[in-house]
From Swiss-Prot:
GO terms for molecular function: chromatin binding; histone binding. Keywords: Chromatin regulator, Cytoplasm, Developmental protein, Nucleus. Signal peptide: none annotated. The gene is Stpg4. Expressed in ovary and testis. Expressed in spermatocytes I in the pachytene stage, round spermatids, and elongated spermatids. Expressed in the germinal vesicle (GV) stage and stage 2 meiosis (MII) oocytes and pre-implantation embryos until blastocyst stage (at protein level). It is found in: Cytoplasm; Nucleus. GO terms for biological process: epigenetic programing of male pronucleus; pyrimidine-containing compound catabolic process. This is Protein STPG4. It comes from the Eukaryota. Interacts with histone H3. Interacts with histone H4. Interacts with METTL23.
Length: 247
């Protein structure tokens, strides 16, 4: 709601003359006051009717990915490639179909000669690993194309299935003499390693010396009684002692 504009009309105000004594007439200027709402609300005119939030639909990440013209050949969760071959399409076009049928995996596997097998099946015969003469049409067991590569010898356990021939038994024939543990070997004494600078002085032996050691003698009594000066000098300098070694 717009407020009315206030217009102030010009007025004549008498004023005394300072010098001549005649009154002067002063005319006030016409001032137009604009209300504050109209002066500060100019931005309201630029506001238009806008839709509320949620009016527009924003495409999600999945929808954006489906709009990609390039077909993906991978997927998440480690599922691998899932691009359908031409023969498994829902609406195949005759020009897209191959001109031949691909061979089966089992047929290709049967044509290959396997040199190994699973744990519960024995290995193939070595004679089947070589090229055969297709012109031979004999029953099994009537001929031997190739001899056995290594003569087989019986083993005690199924774990040792080596086809290599063992050592001949003549190396392990018993000999005369005591068996292991029936005698004791006498090892020759070995000299200890010593230094050339070894001291020859005997260790921890009594030393035959006539020099008395500490405590081997006792002080003798001063008899007759000496003066205090001589007795003091005897105690300080050990002038009077009695050797108890007895030599």
């Amino acid at each position: 709601m717009a407020e009315p504009t206030v217009v102030i009309a010009p007025t004549t105000v008498p004023r005394e003359d300072l010098g001549h004594g005649e009154p002067l007439l002063m005319t006030a200027k016409q001032v137009k006051k604009t209300p504050g709402l109209e002066r500060e609300g100019w931005w309201r005119l630029t506001i238009t009717d806008t839709p509320i939030p949620g009016t527009y639909h924003f495409r999600t990440f999945t929808e954006e990915a489906l709009l990609n013209p390039v077909k993906i050949t991978y997927n998440f969760k480690n599922e691998g490639r899932k691009k359908l071959p031409l023969v498994l399409r829902n609406d195949p076009v005759p020009t897209d179909l191959p001109q031949y049928s691909p061979p089966d995996f089992l047929e290709l596997l049967k044509k290959q000669t396997a040199s190994y097998s699973f744990k519960d099946k024995p290995r193939a015969d070595p004679s089947t690993l070589v090229d055969k003469d297709e012109s031979l049409h004999l029953c099994p067991g009537q001929y031997e194309v190739l001899p056995a590569p290594v003569p087989k010898s019986p083993a005690r356990s199924f774990v040792f299935r080596s086809s290599v021939q063992r050592f001949p038994p003549n190396y392990f024939t018993p000999h005369e003499g005591p068996g292991p543990g029936d005698y004791e070997l006498k090892a020759s004494p070995k000299g200890s390693i010593t230094s050339c600078f070894r001291s020859k002085v005997p260790r921890f032996l009594p030393v035959s010396s006539k020099t008395p050691g500490p405590g081997a003698y006792t002080s003798s009594r001063q008899f007759p009684k000496q003066s205090s000066t001589i007795a003091k000098m005897g105690r300080e300098h050990s002038l009077f002692f009695n050797n108890t070694i007895g030599f």
